[in-house]
Amino acid sequence: MSEPYYSDDHVTIYHGDCRDILPLIGPVELVLTDPPYGINYVSNSGAGRGTAPITNDGARLSLRLYRSVLPLLDADHVLWFTRWDAWPDVWVDLGQWFPMRGLLVWDKGSPGMGDLRHWGPSYELIASAGKGQIVGSRDGSVLRYPTVAPAGRQHPTEKPVEMLSHLVAKLDASTVLDPFMGSGSTLRAAKDLGRKAIGIEIEERYCEIAAKR
């Protein structure tokens, strides 16, 4: 099996293409991930800061990428971040491999990235799939959490750990997998809850950031 980039009692990080590493990982209870959207995103927020493009974020490459990843996933729950112009494809493709359970809405409270000449998106969507069930009382499908402040952001599309912790805590998952790990927010959330976490990231700089978290 490929040697981990980093490993401790709770977290294992692999540096590489998830399509190469996923076949080497056994079943997990939860896949929680934010894959490339396919929008060629380049952050231009802040002078001289955060201008690097996201790897594999071209539309055709991204679509081909996640379609090749889905058959490799073996999980009870899948929570898959997406956006308004990508979710129909995600819904259809994810539904070929897992029973679909619905869409969650992340209400950010303020507009996010996008074309400044049109409406600013203040939400993201999360496709929920799998045979598993939530733990405890039934929650609503709208999650209200502010975005990570730009000054503390370590990845262009970083998600708040508090929100990810809420999602992980609601599912009976001893092991959480994020095949598009980014800066490791999902792994941080899982570790804080005492869960095992596996992350895969193609860019080494983000593996290093995640390992330090």
Where are these regions (language model features)?
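Short functional hotspots where side chains directly engage DNA or cofactors
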Residues: 209-213
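Core catalytic lobe of class I
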Residues: 2-208
